[in-house]
Amino acid sequence: MGASIDDYSLVHKNILHSEDLLKYILETSAYPREHEQLKGLREVTEKHEWSSALVPADEGLFLSMLLKLMNAKRTIEIGVYTGYSLLTTALALPEDGKITAIDVNKSYYEIGLPFIQKAGVEHKINFIESEALPVLDQMLEEMKEEDLYDYAFVDADKSNYANYHERLVKLVRIGGAILYDNTLWYGSVAYPEYPGLHPEEEVARLSFRNLNTFLAADPRVEISQVSIGDGVTICRRLY
């Protein structure tokens, strides 16, 4: 039986349905560790019309920890929005780290740019205003062995995640990580049907159900689907 839209709150882009527990996590663990410029960017983004696309602060800390544990230096980000996850990545990378960041809307990136500049990490970022697929295809054509990436983070058009995966599994080195955001889609992926969603949300929900099944069966990666934010799937490239 399908779930009603009333069963889950879509107010917060978070798989954790206890608002009290979420508030506790953010106020106890996340916000005290949040970089000053990340806090400023978050507060500005929360006032934006598409604020639901903001990566939560606890997820940001998770991404930062993973990047540091991996000693990542070269990363790809597909879907930037105002740049919260991008700034998180730039702060986590070493001084000579490099990020290729791709988004169709530079105006959103420019909202976050002053915070990136104040944090002193703009030099790590190569922002490309474009659809991602042609950029990834060009990168594959020009790629040399030493150009492989350590890490990729995808938070963009949901119906294209599988297409991005086919390219990223070649662009990211063996042992590197590819992360997909929103893969639990408010918890709605657990149900064959989920009445009440807007048509574009339903398209995304079905795309994620298909993606989750596909990634679980992909022998090129090992995966872990983490219940943080709106669900993050980590893929480690095996070959």
From Swiss-Prot:
Its EC number is 2.1.1.336. The keyword Methyltransferase applies. 4'-O-methyltransferase converting norbelladine to 4'-O-methylnorbelladine. 4'-O-methylnorbelladine is a precursor to all Amaryllidaceae alkaloids such as galanthamine, lycorine and haemanthamine, and including haemanthamine- and crinamine-type alkaloids, promising anticancer agents. Can use norbelladine, N-methylnorbelladine and dopamine as substrate, but not caffeic acid, vanillin, 3,4-dihydroxybenzaldehyde and tyramine. It holds the Pfam family Methyltransf_3. Optimum temperature is 45 degrees Celsius. This is Norbelladine 4'-O-methyltransferase. It catalyses: norbelladine + S-adenosyl-L-methionine = 4'-O-methylnorbelladine + S-adenosyl-L-homocysteine + H(+). SUPFAM superfamilies: S-adenosyl-L-methionine-dependent methyltransferases. S-adenosyl-L-methionine binds at V55, E77, G79, V80, S85, D103, A132, D157. The lineage of its organism: Eukaryota, Viridiplantae, Streptophyta, Embryophyta, Tracheophyta. One of its GO terms (molecular function) is metal ion binding. The keyword Methyltransferase applies.
